[in-house]
Amino acid sequence: MDPEPPEPSTGVDSVPRQPPSAHSGPDAQAPSAGGASGTMSQDTEVDMKEVELNEMEPEKQPMNAASGAAVAVVAAGGAEKNGLVKIKVAGSRGWVRTRWALLLLFWLGWLGMLAGAVVIIVRAPRCRELPAQSWWHKGALYRIGDLQAFQGRDAGDLAGLKGRLDYLSTLKVKGIVLGPIHENQEDDVAGTNLEQIHPALGSKEDFDSLLQSAKKKSIRVILDLTPNYRGQNPWFLPDEITTVATKVEDALKFWMQAGVDGFQFRDVGNLTNASSFLAKWQDMTKNISEDRLLIAGTESSDLHQIRSLLESTKDLLLTSSYLSNPSFTGKHVEFLVTQYLNTTGSRWCSWSLSQTGLLTSFVPAQLLRLYQLLLFTLPGTPVFSYGDEIGLEAAVPPGQPLKAPVMLWDESSFPNTSRSVSSSKTVKAQSQDPGSLLSLFRRLSDQRSKERSLLHGDFHILSSGPDLFSYVRQWDQNERFLVVLNFGNVGQPAKLGTSSLPTSTSLPARVDLMLSTQPGRKESASVELEHLTLEPHEGLLLRFPYVA
């Protein structure tokens, strides 16, 4: 017989077979129990080693195309099988229902959020539209009538004023009312040139430089063009008014081209046909820019004359002596303010005690802080003269004409008079004292320029005691402010009545104290209105939040 052909090679060496044992065979006897156990243990150990070698041998073989393809085919087959299983599971009824349920929940949740947003928008109170405001609506104006007195004794010019702009910036004023600074021969129309700066005060180049520097600090410059400011009649004689008016109109064009932001005319009560001239000059400034301001000043406190002047022009600021009444009681000041607001109607007001003078000329020293708080929180533009922020007093020696007081920057500014002046009255000393009049002025000016309720908020007077004047300033959903002023010489409980408030406004039980005119009171504290008591001559600025 032919021999059987050998088995084909698989590419892996076969393990050689062991020769049969000498004891194998049908006739062989089984060994003893002990010998059998030892032999089996050895055989098992040998077999395990052979198995490990067989498992390690393929790992030692080099990879070739055939083996790589085989592995890839196996992997692909496994992945295809897993994918088919996932497709079958995803297409099952349970998963289809689950996906539809989740999709439905998503859209229901989205529609619910949309409906909630619509309800919130519809039910939320609408914000009031902000009124159109110009720069003079947003803060105080600062008058520098005598440039030399403002800077020092008989030494001051436009270049020196430029060096004081940093100080003016700390006061947060929005504009300075400068001058008059033009050439004026006393009571001489021909010798008056409204377009020429007095040589002692500087040149046109100095003025242009001042304008540019002031604008960089967001301070506007208003120029006083009162023609005959050195003479007896500020507007010359009535039969010269035509010539004067022509000079004024030419000067308006000249200075507007130079970049001046506004103009002031004082003592308009002495100007023949003042209403018609003011209206014409206002039109001239508005034709150039709506952002130009016109200020008129009068010493009159007659409401009929004041209303006539205000009705003649649009956006006219009028300074007067209306509030300079010798009666300093809360009820009387409340009456004056109420009458003025009722007379002016919706027109924008300005608040001062005169067209040129200092607060100390009209208000007792103990009420200076109170009047600062009053002027800064009434609805309108507060107008101050230089020195009002430090309580500057006009020193007039007996028998001498009234002169503009020298600004007290430091001890070196003290006037050469026999009257003693305290060093605490200077700008230098008060700048270092957080409880000073100057510090109070700066804080009030800062609040006035950034709080909407104080900028253009509604004004509501509260009923209170005879020596008290109290009111609320509020705008839409912004923080509200409560002002309580005690003009009396003794401490008094507030006892605020709210019957005059609109139904949408009410006073809370507790309010926050922003500031007091008396340095001793603890600020930033919560105050219970029912037990609120004011010290003599004390004013409080309190605030409380809007509640829907």
Sequence positions of predicted segments:
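Carbohydrate-interacting/catalytic domains
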Residues: 1-177, 183, 208-214, 275-284, ...
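Hydrophobic faces of well-ordered beta-strands that scaffold small-molecule active sites
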Residues: 140-142, 176-178, 221-223, 263-265, ...
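A cross-domain feature marking catalytic cores of carbohydrate-active enzymes
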Residues: 146, 180, 223-229, 267-269, ...
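Aromatic-lined carbohydrate-binding/catalytic grooves of carbohydrate-active enzymes
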Residues: 149-152, 165-209, 219, 230-238, ...
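Short, acidic/polar
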Residues: 154-168, 241-256, 364-372
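Short loop/turn motifs at secondary-structure junctions
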Residues: 172-173, 251, 256-261, 352, ...
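Conserved alpha/beta catalytic core and glycan-binding cleft of carbohydrate-active enzymes
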Residues: 232, 236-238, 259, 282-409
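Active-site neighborhood of glycoside hydrolase catalytic domains
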Residues: 244-304
